[in-house]
Amino acid sequence: MRDQKYGAVVNIGSVAGQLGVSEGAIYGILKASVTHYTRCLATELKQHGVRVNCVAPGPMKTARFEATRIVDPEMMDSQKAPLVRYGEPGEIANAVAFLLSDQAKFINGQVLCVD
């Protein structure tokens, strides 16, 4: 990408890295570091024409999520959750595809919360 002076990277963070999540401190800290790394890398690689962004999913309907249930189900009914449902993996894929596309060629160093 550096040699071509063009490219895009999308890291996967989590809204848990943006918000405090009950009983999820370590997970939240790790995902917050992904957000910080994204912004640092975006600054470092912009001179090479490489964009770096991050998608931060909210609670997703996956087998792992069903097994761990890190997010309190009551949160889904509170005002903290923008939508009262779990996301689907395909919705995250759409956000990643957008950030990798030329439609997002003026977006760099951003975190797109998909929740």
Residue ranges of predicted features:
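Residue(s) in the substrate-gating loop at a strand-loop-helix junction
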Residues: 14
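Conserved catalytic-site region of short-chain dehydrogenase/reductase
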Residues: 17-19
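A glycine/serine/threonine-rich, flexible loop-to-helix segment
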Residues: 26, 47, 57-81, 86, ...
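Catalytic tyrosine of NAD(P)H-dependent dehydrogenase/reductases that use a Tyr as the general acid/base
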Residues: 27, 35
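Active-site helix of classical SDR
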Residues: 30, 38
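Alpha-helical segment proximal to the catalytic Tyr-Lys
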Residues: 43-47, 105
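Conserved SDR Rossmann-fold cofactor-binding beta-strand/turn motif
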Residues: 51-61, 100, 113-115
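C-terminal substrate-recognition "lid" of short-chain dehydrogenase/reductases
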Residues: 85-114
